[in-house]
Structures are given as C-alpha cells and as structure tokens.
A protein has these predicted regions:
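Iron-sulfur cluster-binding electron-transfer modules in prokaryotic oxidoreductases
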Residues: 2-253
Length: 253
C-alpha cells in the first residue's frame, strides 16, 4: 500500500521519477561518485578527529541540511579482481601458518582452497551497499563483509563467480521503496539476466549478502536457487569447514 501511495506522488514525468530513472540508467556512475564522498569523509575524520568532525558536520547538517555524519560512517569500498585474489592469498597464507603450527582444525577449513580445477561454484552478488561501503574507521572488524565472504567460500572449496557488469546491477529495492515499480522491475530483470548467465542457466547457486535485497530477488526471480549467507553456510559449508563456537552474542540480519 505504501508503495502504491508513493507511486501516485511520483508519476512518470515528475522530477522525482526522472531522477530515479537517471540513477537507474547510470547506476555504476552514481555508485562510483559516492565512493570519493566516503573517502573524503574518512580523510576528514582522520585529520580532525572524532570530536571535531562531529561538531563541524553537525553544524553543517543544521545549516545546510546535509546528511548527519557519525563515527560509524563507512569508508569507500569496491569489489575488484584484486580483492578476489587477495582473499585467495590470505587463505593460502592461513593454510601455511596452520601447517607450521600443526593446527589440524584450521588446516581442514582451508585445505580445499587449492583445488581450483574441481571446486564447486557459487555466483556471489554482493548488495549495492556492500559493493560501495566498507568498514568504519575504528571498526573492530578487520575485513569488509565481501572479503570475508569470499574467503569463507574459498575455504569451503568454492570458486566464486561474480555476474558481469556487477556495478550496474541492483535488485530494484531502492526504486520499489519510492513507488517507482516499473523501474524496480526493470532493474530486477537486468539482474536476473546477469545471474542466469553467470550461473550457467541456474546450474550454480546464487548468494546475496543482504536480506532485504534477497527478499525482493526471491519475489522477482523464480528460476534460480537464491541463498543468504547463514542459509548458504548451513546448506553447503557446514560439512566442509570446522566451526568454533563463540561465547558472545551474534546478530543474524
């Protein structure tokens, strides 16, 4: 109902609809333009410190109406083939370290990475947010989610496949939430075509790391098997990795 109401307030031909259509047609460029903004904010945080940065940006927010900055604002991020190779190298390094330390559990978790020729395959579509935004400056986590996901998949013996022209792709949630349902469906169709090709017509499972995105994908894409991380790990990786129970709260989104 909310989407229908918003659709009525943003009819075709309106300025808001034209803006949404422009973003959809130039999505890769829009995402690329966001990364320097995040990098600039991170640079300002590094130079000014948290307290000064908070004071200055709060004043700018009150006067100019710019989005409110917080210390949790992420750095910029981009998925590249280099990061995919880096994840492989990290897994290989961990395997070598585990061998020297005779840590059999960690070795089991990583030993299958080297079997590239016989590896299972998975199509990984990181959400638009995770393609563009990394970690906050003072995050206790060492790696962005995409890097962690790639590393985990490779430790489980999976070859990771990204869909072609991934920077241009989106499930359409952004436009659906604004009532631009036709644009949302168009973006979903583009994504489906790219995933269909990458998965070799549904031969390989498709993984998306953001539950709202996966929810819409499941509503619009019927001919492929789609998974979120916890579900994929439970279905495909639980017998291939060694898990160590942690004594702390864990949030599953």
């Amino acid at each position: 109902l909310t989407h229908i109401i918003r659709q009525e307030t943003l009819p075709k031909g309106s300025l808001g609809y034209k803006a949404g259509d422009f973003v959809a047609n130039h999505f890769a460029g829009v995402k690329s333009s966001l990364r320097p903004v995040l990098s600039l904010a991170n640079f300002g945080h590094s130079v000014l410190g948290t307290k000064a940065m908070s004071s200055i940006t709060k004043g700018m927010h009150n006067v100019l109406g710019i989005p409110l900055w917080t210390p949790a604002m992420p750095k910029s991020y981009k998925v590249t083939s280099y990061k995919l190779q880096a994840a492989t190298d990290m897994s290989d390094k961990l395997q070598a370290t585990s061998t020297m330390q005779n840590d059999s559990a960690a070795l089991v978790a990583c030993s299958s990475v080297a079997r590239n020729s016989t590896a299972d395959k998975v199509v990984y579509f990181p959400s638009c947010i995770n393609q563009t935004m990394g970690l906050p400056k003072k995050s206790p986590v060492e790696q962005p989610l995409v890097n962690k996901m790639i590393s985990l998949l490779q430790k489980g013996g999976y070859e990771v496949i990204f869909p072609k022209d991934m920077d241009k792709l989106c499930c359409g949630t952004i436009w659906e939430s604004k009532g631009m349902l036709d644009i949302a469906d168009r973006k979903a169709a583009e994504l489906e075509a790219a995933l269909w090709e990458a998965s070799e017509q549904g031969k390989y499972p498709v993984l998306c790391d953001q539950s709202p995105c996966l929810h819409r994908m499941r509503e619009t894409i019927q001919k492929m098997k789609l998974y979120e991380p916890a579900e994929f790990i439970y279905t495909f990786l639980r017998d291939k990795l060694v898990f160590t129970q942690t004594d702390r709260p864990v949030a599953v989104h």
